[in-house]
Amino acid sequence: MNARETARQAVKSSVVLLKNEGGVLPLPQGAKVALFGWAQWDAVLSGNGSGAARGGVSPSVVDALKAVGVRPEESLSAWYQDEFKAYHKDNPSEFDFTKIKDAVNSGLMYEIFGKYIPNPPEFSPPQELLDEASRWTDTALWIVGRKSGGEECDRRLENDYYLSNQEKVLLEAICAHFPKVAVVLNGNGLMDLSWVEEHSQIQALLFLGVPGEEGPAALAELLVGKANPSGKLSVTIAKRRNDYPAWEDFSWDKDHPKQIKTYEDYGLTPPLVDRAFAHRPVTAYREDIYLGYRYFDSFGIEPLYPFGFGLSYTCLLYTSPSPRDP
């Protein structure tokens, strides 16, 4: 097994199937699917900052699905591709490395390496494309992308942890036109998922995370049943953000610098390694021993999806036992 095969196998073994009702997954051979979301053309493959990686050899989710026999609705996917190209032409990615020297001298490394990377806007397809796609298939696949979450302070509440207004509009449009909807979560961190149970059309939910360069190909194989999802959650997904005990201590938000907490805010003395920094954000783990699932278990907080949760395509049938002569 070469490196690419190993990377692909790692993805297939770690993707978590959170929901699968009505047998919407795996997709049958030659399935017709309406694809939604900008991430179908630009899947989030890695974190950012020091965790960033760009192989440059990954297919899009669209092309990966075609390679395993799935038939995406061409007009809709072509429209998304045009919209995405136009967005990046008008919003080129820029990073001014000349600022690093000044940042080092001032002790404000946080200002450079905690940079927030906003998600591209979620585009709303024209009504005629929605109508055309819904006449062609009853199944929709929405790839929900999140580019943030790879470095200390680059998460936001609005348009990040929660769906953006554009995503909410798209969600309603998808569910109004397609009775079978599968959603793939493609991003660095967790997000609010209360909207999943509020829409009965969403029959399948996959947590892809950031899968690396073999992610699109591995995802396609999982969606058509060439591989069986076998990943389990390494975290707890809460029903609401306030159920996380550390939520109120999360303060690394450069949009609101006055809310950033330091050692002094907790009555602590900075260690020597941090005293050279003019402003070093800190989060205190006040949960003590009740980190992660221990908090939910100990205090009876029911999660949306518990630590270790993960479904598969396998169906087991149990019948009543009966004695049999040896």
Regions flagged by a language model, labelled:
Residues 1-320:
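C-terminal non-catalytic regions of proteins with extracellular/luminal or membrane-system context
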Residues 321-326:
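A short, hydrophobic C-terminal helix/tail in secreted or cell-surface proteins
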